[in-house]
Design a protein with these regions (language model features):
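Divalent cation-coordinating acidic motifs and surrounding scaffolds
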Residues: 2-247
Length: 247
């Protein structure tokens, strides 16, 4: 932001409000969220919810490589807030019984995260849809969210089980389970930002957004993940820019 052309004497002009710089604007946005959600703690929990089936290897690598950069950027933007980061890696045990979900609960020990997530590998996935319901179950039942700003970054290249989420899916009973988990996220005022890789997950993301919005909350965003972007730092930029738009 351009500096003011002349200095303002605060005592002489007590009602003058100076323009906020970018950092102050970001803090003001988060303060509004805290006020709207009747919370007072200056804490920010960021959870990565990632499809960890076989086709997602390069995207999991980006998450592994760039967590510390994301942390640094957000700490600079929101210096007054205490951050925690966590991961849920979901697969498809519904259709591929050897698949398991994995999670790393929210922690502020960012320097320890690379060691933990380097063990995560992309594998499994039987049919096209994946077990979103299993992933969101962990989000709601196992992650230890704090009473502050809560954001999920959901990264996927395939939709969810359930005929309302993926046309022709044979596991129709999974849809209502996921419906309830999405509604619970809305009730808990967890902001959800979805990065869709290709067009396959679009129907699932769109239904989830509709359910979320119907709960009176509009903090559910969908945006494309450019598969052609190979630049180091692209994932960091995408995450940080998305967060500054929703907070």
């Amino acid at each position: 932001m351009d500096s003011e052309k002349k200095e303002i004497n605060d005592e002489a002009c007590p009602n003058t409000i100076k323009p906020e710089n970018k950092k102050d604007q970001n803090i003001s946005k988060i303060n509004k969220i805290l006020s709207d959600n009747t919370v007072s703690e200056k804490v920010f929990d960021l959870l990565f919810l990632i499809d960890a089936t076989g086709s997602m290897s390069s995207y999991i690598k980006a998450a592994k490589d760039e967590t510390q950069n994301i942390s640094k950027e957000l700490r600079n933007l929101y210096p007054e807030y205490h951050f925690q980061y966590g991961y849920v890696f979901y697969r498809d045990p519904i259709d591929s019984h050897d698949d398991i979900h994995e999670m790393i609960d929210l922690t502020d020990q960012v320097n320890n995260l690379p060691e933990k997530i380097k063990k995560i590998e992309a594998y499994g996935g039987g049919d096209l849809p994946e077990d979103w319901a299993g992933g969101y179950k962990l989000v709601n039942e196992k992650i230890t969210w704090r009473n502050g700003v809560k954001v999920i970054i959901h990264l996927a290249d395939a939709g969810a089980h359930g005929t309302d989420y993926t046309s022709g899916d044979k596991y129709s009973s999974e849809g209502p389970k996921l419906d309830n988990y999405i509604r619970e996220c809305a009730n808990r005022k967890i902001t959800i930002v979805c990065f869709q890789i290709g067009s396959e997950p679009h129907k699932s993301f769109s239904r989830a957004k509709m359910l979320y919005n119907n709960m009176g909350n509009n903090n559910f965003k969908i945006q494309d993940f450019d598969q052609n972007k190979k630049d180091p730092g692209y994932f960091t930029d995408l995450v940080v820019n998305a967060i500054t738009k929703v907070t």
